[in-house]
């Protein structure tokens, strides 16, 4: 138990995840991961003088999620921590829609109550599952990075994941050792959800028939991708600034000599600015790239993007 406190405390310091006097909103479902997170942050709170709050999102998928929400409210009351509950008033048809709804509502609660950090209970096992989920649905290197330690939202609030170096197995043992109460969500067992299929079918198959240490291999690969993608993003931003200070002719000559990887990133950024993220897929980026190559003497890159928006 002491080892896990120490390990997570060390990760918070090494990755500069949280600061003294932070106002932290803990996203909690009632499962072992979020209950563990609440316990750990409450124990560390005196050292950091954090101001803690708890938020729970009820997707209304089943009876167990409602029971979990009720129990989380009781825990918050017992700990004298501010509690916020959000219940959906319309049916969330899939995991992606549920995730979008959940993050938006939590951000709204955090912003309106002046929390500067949202903490989630995503762990090392979630990171691996998210890697496969993103990879199998089709994504870029940036998209396949999986879960990051921290991410800034447009509101200025940071999402922080202090359990990313801790496995679900470690959290399970932690919960058992100190007898924490649990209210499992039965939706986590349903194979209707793709993430559950990855957890219950794909990963056990890979461990058995390909590599028993596949979790560690993927976790290391996710870290490498993150670091390399961070570097590429910085390079792209520098080139983007240089590119659009010049005239149309300078832009064409400059782009002509860019590596394809950077060219794709430049196009992706322009699509996001001029159109929307919904247009940012491999097919659209490649169509614009090839069209620009054929017509670079005639049109600027921005004009090519406008053609595809009509």
Curated annotation (Swiss-Prot):
InterPro entries in the cross-refs: Rossmann-like_a/b/a_fold (IPR014729), TilS/TtcA_N (IPR011063), tRNA_Ile_lys_synt (IPR012094), tRNA_Ile_lys_synt_N (IPR012795)
Keywords carried by this UniProt record: ATP-binding, Chloroplast, Ligase, Nucleotide-binding, Plastid, tRNA processing
Enzyme Commission numbers on file: 6.3.4.19
Cellular component, GO annotation: chloroplast
Location within or outside the cell: Plastid, Chloroplast
Gene3D superfamilies with a match to the protein in the record: 1.20.59.20, HUPs
Free-text domain note: The N-terminal region contains the highly conserved SGGXDS motif, predicted to be a P-loop motif involved in ATP binding.
Protein family per UniProt: Belongs to the tRNA(Ile)-lysidine synthase family.
Known function: Ligates lysine onto the cytidine present at position 34 of the AUA codon-specific tRNA(Ile) that contains the anticodon CAU, in an ATP-dependent manner. Cytidine is converted to lysidine, thus changing the amino acid specificity of the tRNA from methionine to isoleucine.
Protein's recorded name: tRNA(Ile)-lysidine synthase, chloroplastic
Lineage, broadest ranks: Eukaryota, Viridiplantae, Streptophyta, Mesostigmatophyceae, Mesostigmatales
UniProt gene name: tilS
């Amino acid at each position: 138990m002491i080892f896990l406190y120490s390990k997570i405390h060390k990760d918070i310091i090494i990755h500069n995840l949280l600061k003294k006097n932070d106002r932290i909103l803990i996203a909690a479902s009632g499962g072992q991961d979020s209950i563990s997170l609440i316990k750990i942050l409450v124990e560390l709170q005196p050292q950091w003088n954090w101001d803690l709050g708890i938020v729970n999102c009820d997707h209304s998928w089943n009876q167990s999620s409602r029971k979990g929400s009720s129990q989380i409210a009781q825990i918050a009351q017992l700990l004298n921590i501010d509690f916020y509950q959000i219940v959906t008033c319309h049916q969330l048809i899939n995991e992606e829609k549920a995730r979008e709804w959940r993050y938006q509502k939590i951000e709204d609660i955090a912003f309106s109550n002046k929390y500067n950090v949202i903490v989630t209970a995503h762990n090392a096992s979630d990171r691996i599952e998210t890697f496969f989920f993103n990879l199998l649905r089709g994504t870029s290197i940036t998209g396949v990075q999986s879960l990051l330690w921290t991410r800034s939202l447009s509101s200025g609030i940071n999402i922080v994941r202090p359990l990313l170096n801790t496995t679900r197995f470690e959290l399970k043992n932690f919960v058992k050792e100190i007898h924490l109460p649990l209210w499992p969500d039965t939706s986590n067992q349903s194979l209707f959800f793709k993430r559950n299929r990855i957890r219950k079918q794909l990963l056990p198959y890979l461990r058995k028939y390909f590599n028993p240490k596949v979790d560690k291999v993927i976790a290391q690969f996710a870290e490498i991708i993150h670091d390399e993608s961070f570097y590429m993003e910085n390079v792209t931003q520098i080139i983007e600034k240089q590119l659009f200070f010049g005239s149309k002719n300078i832009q064409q000559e400059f782009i002509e000599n860019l590596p394809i990887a950077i060219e794709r990133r430049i196009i992706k950024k322009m699509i996001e600015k001029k159109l929307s993220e919904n247009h940012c897929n491999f097919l659209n980026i490649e169509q614009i790239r090839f069209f620009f190559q054929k017509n670079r003497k005639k049109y600027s890159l921005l004009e090519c993007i406008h053609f595809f928006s009509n």
